[in-house]
Amino acid sequence: MVEEKKYRVESDLLGELKVPAEALYGVQTQRGINNYHISRKTMVDNPDFIIAIAFVKLAAIETNHSLGVINDEISGAIAQACREIIEGKWHENFPIDMVQGGAGTSVNMNANEVIANRALEIMGHEKGDYQYCSPNDHCNCGQSTNDVYPTSIRLALIRMNTHLVGALTGLISAFRYKADEYSDAIKMGRTQLQDAVPMSFGQEFNAYANNLEEEILNLERNVKLLHEINMGGTAIGTGLNAVPGFAKLCAANLSKLTGENFETATDLVEATPDTGAYVSYSSALKRLAVKLSKICNDLRLMASGPRCGLNEINLPPKAPGSSIMPGKVNPVIPEVTNQVCFKVIGNDTTISFAAEAGQLELNVMEPIITESLFESLTWMKNAIETLTSECILGITVNKERCYEMVKNSIGIVTALNPIIGYKKSTKVAKEAHETGRSVYDIVIEQGIMSKEELDKALDPNEMLQSHKLTLK
């Protein structure tokens, strides 16, 4: 008796299976739970994905109702169930592992079963009484995993991209703030880790901000590719079992529901196995990761020391740095951001291999593409938010040390090139390097320039921008 209350029995092609009595999912979801213990990350860990598939199912039921395929009562109950999921309800009923075989069939059926069973409850029936509302005949009407799954992925990625861009915008603002705060702080620019010419921290931090703004534009360019969908193509793009007009009306309904501009692919047979949009978007994430990792490398290098490194900036101390070396504090926030960037770059390689592995009319490797993209987006967003709040906003600059390094640098001799010529400047630089004396003292001692001329030429602030030049 207790056993009967804890479980209900459902059946499918492979036979009967016990399902928890209170679960909104059914037999095919239970098989997915039993089969896949891979990533230990489920749909529950990706609420944007659950919401996305509910939007797709809502657009589909509205389309089928408008075309006279499903009656008012069933379509109304299914639509209500979808809206509840979109509002955040019933998400615990999506326990399927994100990495799975079957090209996402377990995910699609998980959604179909949850929606069907919730619709049954709304209509006053028992869960599992599928004669009144079927996961396949009603919730999946005119659809296939092969159009529902990729469309849901695309919508989820669009939603997650918005979160990522928001985090990036915050990081850019933080760099702009620091650029303003230290606009007058002079430092030595370096190329190949050798002294180059002076610059300001305002220029350095603004360059980081501008660099990242380019990445927002690149992400937005690539996310547009995700707005082409194959809903209505059903199994392989031929539209079998979808009524005429379903594809375009479903895209229009999905656009209206989400506020996004979705369009039906021109060739649904071509679109069904195509993963090019995922590859392009992942490439944009990789490009962001490469640039962000470089910025973190710079921050760690500029903060090196405190006595025997550059010690140009101070990063906020976040944790004791060693179990054996007293007083050591490490740049842990840039370090963790670096590691996230490595992960995103690696995920891009996984996505490339999975995209290449498609065969004929379908790419069955979409689950690993999906999980890799979701992981990259989630990790990157979290890392950027952490970098912003726990590191960038707390950066301070060691102005006096930076100025002393500029003043004593051999690199400032570059500013004398237009005045005394490259050859003479090279001799001054060589002597300064060999003797340890300053460029300033050597030029004055040898009478190459007057003190007044030299003071003006070697004013660090004058070296931060271009000037009118007349060669003698």
Regions found by a protein language model. Name each.
Residues 1-472:
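Conserved, well-structured ligand/cofactor-binding cores
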